[in-house]
Amino acid sequence: MSKIIFMGTPDFSAPILKALHEAHGVSLVITQPDKPVGRKRVLTPPPVKVMAESLGIEVYQPESMKSDEAFERVHALSPDLIVTAAFGQILPERVLDIPRLGCINVHASLLPKYRGGAPIHKAIINGEKYSGVTIMYMVKRLDAGDMIDSVQVPIEINDTVGTLHDKLSVAGTDLLLEVMPSVLSGTNNRTPQNDSEATFASNVSREEEYVTFDRTALEVHNHIRGLSPWPVAFANFDGKAMKLWASEIAEGSGAPGEIIQADKAGLVIATNDGAVRITSLQPAGKKRMDAASFVAGAKSQLVGMKFNEA
């Protein structure tokens, strides 16, 4: 049996690890260190570590794959193949050169589009009709290696990062299992990427989380769902940041950012060509709530108030 190292960290990667281990056996899992989570800063293991331990696989959590210790750990195992999926660290060339069959990555986009760390977010924000998963060889440049295979996944109008993430994780799992026999036998396809068609999906910045309403309703809706359920979009309301968790396209007109309707269905906010309805939100210092609860508890008239008012 081939020796396989799996590298991954978040929820996206855990089912991929499980399926890979059950089909081919994984000798070692490498994942990010445990991190403090929440207000109480509780040290929490990444989902891939939890999955690996439930499967009885040895886990290694280096601070950096660039360290001599990490190199030696991988080198000592003499793996035939490294499989990565949303690992969160760039592998140095000397690690990429270790496995006899190379290193392959399960990437959540249709490469060469959306290379980088936030392909799911950026595909939704940009209003793409399709996303997908590509399995490719890893090279020194980020997400630029030869492609083995890909699968297309439709993006529905109300998909969020969360729902699309789950669809792509399933698609990535299925595609990996499909290509593994040919990868292990060295008979798989290798298609070079066209660098002239490459686009990049860098991690979402704080500035990109800020929603403006002087755009089309569809652009605003895409922005909100493209950041939900993490890191969550926000806009300024009554002098404070309000997180906007969920939205839908609505009818109506008014000045961009103006609340034109507030009832049990939510807050309807005007855009430059129509409106969006906010159905779930989080006022500053409070927990997430449905917009109907916010409307019911409002101490002042909401209709006519504006988001992002200077």
UniProtKB/Swiss-Prot annotation:
The EC number(s) this enzyme carries: 2.1.2.9
Protein keywords: Protein biosynthesis, Transferase
Binding site for (6S)-5,6,7,8-tetrahydrofolate: S109, L110, L111, P112
Protein name: Methionyl-tRNA formyltransferase
Keyword Transferase annotated: yes
Reported function: Attaches a formyl group to the free amino group of methionyl-tRNA(fMet). The formyl group appears to play a dual role in the initiator identity of N-formylmethionyl-tRNA by promoting its recognition by IF2 and preventing the misappropriation of this tRNA by the elongation apparatus.
Alphabetized NCBIfam families for the sequence: fmt
PANTHER family reported in the protein's UniProt record: METHIONYL-TRNA FORMYLTRANSFERASE (PTHR11138), METHIONYL-TRNA FORMYLTRANSFERASE, MITOCHONDRIAL (PTHR11138:SF5)
PROSITE patterns: GART
CC terms in the record's Gene Ontology section: cytosol
Reactions performed catalytically: L-methionyl-tRNA(fMet) + (6R)-10-formyltetrahydrofolate = N-formyl-L-methionyl-tRNA(fMet) + (6S)-5,6,7,8-tetrahydrofolate + H(+)
Family membership: Belongs to the Fmt family.
Organism the protein comes from: Macrococcus caseolyticus (strain JCSC5402)
